[in-house]
């Protein structure tokens, strides 16, 4: 290894995207750099006045197989991989008549762009680059004497070092090599993500090979592969993270141009880390209620209110009424077009973010002109059920995203264990409450009436406190009105004792829906029976941590 700068006398350039190449061309011409290139890149450089040698003239072998083989030749790769600080390498190059490269500039076939375009399988496969990654990895490995450039953002830097003859130091070449390895790793991870989805293990191999984890348990390898590889592209950095002393950035899936991360911002200040967290939670929450029109108000990743209405304005009014104090500085999500009437009701409320699939022109104009700091987001499509990924020290936890799709989420599968069967209106409220409870942090208790939340107890370490909190918020946030009486209640998990359910019963709820499954279920059910309260068991839990 050497710490000396190595001037750039000979360069290999092969890029799919030609943007910015003019900067390099000008420097090559000025410095008299010998340039070897391929196909369309060579043509572009020649048009810019660079004296170019085609790769085929170096190898003595033409491009073949529809361009699949261009640079895969010892005359190219030996020139990339020869460590010129090693006398044996230098001697062998001289024996074979091969000249070394000082600089390799490569960007790869646009695989992710091709996938996003909806291309068929054959066209997608053709955009899996082979020669490009080989050159990149070879040059990165041989950073002792070669500078590898994969990022067009570095072209200006490269041009200046070519033009002034200084080249790059070893530390700089290491930095460029690290970027190059990250580039090819992300590229391969993107290909892996696509192939894993489109080329699952065929049924013909199930009897031949059974995937098992390190404990001998059979594994669905399509869902949980032996190596979990994903890549995300940095969209932009954020002002700060969850707190002002934390740095943060937004990354997006290169294969997907939809989803909340790709929201179109129509007004307001830049999104913060907390804005993204709360708005994403609100967005998922309202779509749990589809196809009904729903509005959610979320703060600190918990709903302050959620409601279904005949119109967006009605749904917002009902959702806001649940907890007007907490809604201050919150995030509003609507799964329907925001109308002028809804915008007018939002206007006097301090709100950080509003997100919806669309806005009436008059509604958008009002929000843009009267609430200049309000972040206005438009997301055309509902959320998709991808994996839920959480990083822990030294690893990742991966699970299915919790959706309202379990057997116990269907009210037809519920088991009536106490009281009379709910009438149509009560059942509607129970179904609403059960769907709403999924988005509340555990331990979660939710009271609802007229398909709107009226009291929410969230995030308590015991269920009794969550029950007390839900009742308290129902009865102290409504100008003295008793909203718990006659409401229905939902619990995200079973009642371990009868005491939590008794709090709800004493508050006057008329029906409760909960998973069941406690060893003391009979005590809980008996408390409901004694009070004449309807109780359904779902058999499904919706913890949310």
UniProtKB/Swiss-Prot annotation:
SUPFAM superfamilies: Cytidine deaminase-like, Methylglyoxal synthase-like. Pfam families: AICARFT_IMPCHas, MGS. One of its GO terms (cellular component) is cytosol. GO terms for biological process: 'de novo' IMP biosynthetic process. Pathway: Purine metabolism; IMP biosynthesis via de novo pathway; 5-formamido-1-(5-phospho-D-ribosyl)imidazole-4-carboxamide from 5-amino-1-(5-phospho-D-ribosyl)imidazole-4-carboxamide (10-formyl THF route): step 1/1; Purine metabolism; IMP biosynthesis via de novo pathway; IMP from 5-formamido-1-(5-phospho-D-ribosyl)imidazole-4-carboxamide: step 1/1. Its EC number is 2.1.2.3, 3.5.4.10. Transmembrane segments: none annotated. Gene3D superfamilies: 3.40.140.20, Methylglyoxal synthase-like domain. Residues 1-150 form the MGS-like domain. Signal peptide: none annotated. InterPro entries: AICAR_Tfase_dup_dom_sf, Cytidine_deaminase-like, MGS-like_dom, MGS-like_dom_sf, PurH-like. The IMP cyclohydrolase activity resides in the N-terminal region. Belongs to the PurH family. This is Bifunctional purine biosynthesis protein PurH. The gene is purH.
């Amino acid at each position: 290894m050497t710490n000396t700068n190595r001037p750039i006398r000979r360069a290999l350039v092969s890029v799919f995207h030609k943007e910015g190449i003019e900067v390099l061309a000008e420097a090559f011409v000025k410095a008299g750099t010998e340039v070897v290139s391929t196909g369309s890149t060579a043509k572009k450089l020649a048009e810019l006045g660079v004296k170019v040698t085609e790769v085929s003239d170096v190898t003595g072998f033409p491009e073949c197989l529809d361009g699949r083989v261009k640079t895969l030749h010892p005359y190219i790769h030996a020139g990339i991989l020869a460590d010129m600080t090693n006398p044996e390498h230098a001697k062998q190059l001289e024996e074979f008549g091969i000249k070394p490269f000082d600089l390799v500039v490569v960007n790869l076939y646009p695989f992710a762009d091709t996938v996003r375009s909806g291309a068929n399988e054959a066209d997608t496969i053709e955009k899996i680059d082979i020669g490009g990654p080989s050159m990149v990895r070879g040059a990165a490995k041989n950073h002792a004497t070669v500078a590898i450039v994969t990022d067009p953002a570095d072209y200006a830097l490269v041009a200046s070092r070519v033009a002034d003859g200084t080249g790059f130091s070893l530390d700089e070449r290491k930095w460029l090599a690290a970027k190059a390895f990250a580039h090819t790793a992300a590229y391969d991870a993107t290909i892996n993500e696509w192939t894993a989805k489109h080329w699952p293990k065929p049924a013909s191999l199930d009897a031949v090979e059974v995937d098992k984890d390190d404990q001998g348990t059979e594994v669905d390898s399509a869902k949980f592969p032996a190596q979990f590889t994903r890549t995300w592209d940095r969209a932009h950095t954020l002002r700060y993270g969850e707190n002002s002393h934390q740095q943060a950035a937004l990354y997006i899936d290169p294969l997907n141009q939809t989803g909340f991360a790709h929201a179109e911002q129509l007004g307001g200040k830049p999104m913060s880390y907390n804005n993204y967290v709360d708005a994403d939670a609100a967005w998922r929450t309202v779509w749990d209620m589809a196809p009904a029109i729903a509005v959610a108000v979320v703060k600190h990743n918990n709903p302050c209110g959620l409601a279904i209405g005949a119109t967006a304005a009605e749904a917002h009014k009902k959702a806001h009424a649940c907890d007007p104090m907490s809604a201050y500085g919150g995030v509003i999500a609507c799964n329907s077009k925001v109308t002028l009437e809804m915008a007018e009701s939002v206007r006097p409320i301090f709100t950080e973010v509003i997100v919806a699939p669309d806005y009436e022109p008059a509604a958008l104009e009002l929000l843009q002109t009267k609430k200049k700091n309000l972040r206005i987001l438009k997301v055309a499509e509902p959320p998709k059920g991808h994996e839920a990924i959480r990083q822990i020290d030294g690893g990742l936890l991966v699970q299915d995203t919790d959706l309202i799709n379990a057997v116990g989420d269907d009210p037809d599968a519920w088991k009536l264990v106490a009281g009379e069967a709910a009438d149509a209106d009560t059942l509607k409220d129970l179904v609403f409450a059960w769907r709403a409870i999924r988005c509340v942090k555990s331990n979660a208790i939710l009271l609802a009436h007229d398909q709107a939340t009226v009291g929410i107890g969230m995030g308590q370490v015991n269920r009794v406190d969550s029950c007390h909190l839900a009742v308290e918020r129902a009865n102290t946030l409504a100008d003295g009105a008793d909203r718990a009486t006659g409401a229905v209640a939902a619990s995200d998990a079973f009642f371990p004792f009868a005491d939590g359910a008794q709090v709800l019963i004493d508050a006057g709820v008329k029906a409760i829906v909960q998973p069941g499954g406690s060893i003391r279920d009979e005590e809980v059910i008996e408390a409901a029976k004694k009070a004449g309260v309807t109780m359904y068991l779902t058999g499904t839990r919706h913890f949310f941590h």
